[in-house]
């Protein structure tokens, strides 16, 4: 049983690292690099966004949900108020991710309004995702 706990916690941490790390990479490396390249910026964001959306949004968020539920029972022994809070924030992140990827991001190539929406939805999503990491640390420490 201890191996299962370690395995699912490990998977959860790796998936969270991929999700949050990907957003940090996009905002701290890709965005500043493309800022001075308006001729390729929008198309590059579209291409990078499509790839990250598939693995980051759809695959990793789904697997984070599954591993989070498994960890809730294997490690925490069930739901506690702090886990309810994390789950609530998680669902907000999923909603914002879908709004970003399926609405604003897709239209950002052709619309300045949607580009601005995509930018701010991405920033909000990053902030809330960092909050999820913080809540995860608190839960793991027993709060």
UniProtKB/Swiss-Prot annotation:
Its main subcellular localisation, reduced to a broad class, is: membrane
Renumbered to this chain, the signal peptide range is none
* Gene Ontology CC: one annotated term: plasma membrane
Which InterPro entries is this protein grouped with?
TMEM205-like (IPR025423)
Q: Where in the cell is it found?
A: Cell membrane
Membrane topology (UniProt): Multi-pass membrane protein
Q: Which UniProt keywords apply?
A: Cell membrane, Membrane, Transmembrane, Transmembrane helix
* Annotated transmembrane regions: 7-29, 52-74, 87-105, 120-142
Name-wise, this protein is: Uncharacterized protein aq_363
């Amino acid at each position: 049983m201890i191996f299962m706990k370690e395995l699912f916690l490990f998977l959860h941490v790796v998936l969270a690292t991929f999700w949050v790390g990907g957003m940090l990479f996009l905002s701290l490396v890709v965005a500043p690099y493309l800022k001075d390249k308006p001729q390729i910026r929008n198309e590059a964001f579209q291409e990078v966004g499509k790839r990250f959306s598939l693995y980051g949004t759809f695959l990793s968020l789904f697997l984070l949900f599954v591993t989070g539920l498994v960890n809730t029972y294997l490690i925490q022994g069930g739901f506690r108020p702090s886990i309810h809070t994390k789950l609530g924030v998680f669902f907000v992140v999923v909603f914002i991710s879908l709004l970003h990827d399926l609405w604003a991001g897709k239209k950002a190539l052709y619309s300045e309004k949607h580009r601005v929406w995509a930018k701010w939805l991405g920033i909000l999503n990053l902030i809330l995702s960092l909050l999820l990491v913080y809540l995860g640390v608190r839960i793991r420490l027993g709060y």
